[in-house]
Amino acid sequence: MPDLTPRTSNEDLTKWLTHPRYPRSNSYDPRWVVENQMGPNALWLLEWLAPALGLEALRPGARVLDLGCGRAMTSVFLAREYDAQVTAADLWIKPDDNAGRIAEAGFADRVQPVHAEAHDLPFAEGSFDAIVSVDAYQYFGTDDLYLPTLTRLLRPGGRIGVVVPALREEPQGLEPPEHLEPWWEPGYWCFHSADWWRRQWTRSGAVEVEAADWLDDGWRDWLLWCEVIAAESPEEWHRTMARQVGEMLRHDEGRALGFVRLVGRRKP
């Protein structure tokens, strides 16, 4: 890895983060993405989700809920890349904070930030053509009763798509994968396999599952991003977390950790 520091030029940072799998994301200011990240590279993950979710087929101005949007980078991406009218919902980032960032990006008329908790969403049934959630759904969506409530917000036939940190296989018993024990935290039990998620969504009866798959070499993308954030983030907490997660990913080498993509279509 190059010697990235807070003084690394945008040109060098752009070269390092340019990824052939994510051509749309490559067009965004890398410093803006680094400064506004809250975990794995959300733009990369959304770009991976988009084809399976059918975002390009949405009509101009389609209504999209970005659930757990963080600092609204994904919301800006949805408006810019897919001409969507986006509701950017988050619990932790204040709407005024996101509103400033959205306006600076030039999408104040297309992205509406709101403060909302995932179990108390202030929207009417059938309000959205699509729901997107990137690196957030694992924190509230493992509840077996949650998906039917959320998908009522979709028009009939509308799609929900999520990307979550995940495990390649479900652990057997009560212990985490042995090689990950030094880094394992209780919160990681919300990581599940693609099969686990497919089964949970299918059992809900709320959607027809159209995709539940694993990002090949996703751990490498995650590790690359951790290395950049550990060196470049302006926030010490994020630098520390990136170093810790990066150490775990290097040790794992894709044996257990990665990302799962899920897409479901609301049943009539």
PLM region spans:
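Class I SAM-dependent methyltransferase SAM/SAH-binding core
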Residues: L65, R71-D120
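A short SAM/SAH-binding and catalytic strip from SAM-dependent methyltransferases
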Residues: A130-T142
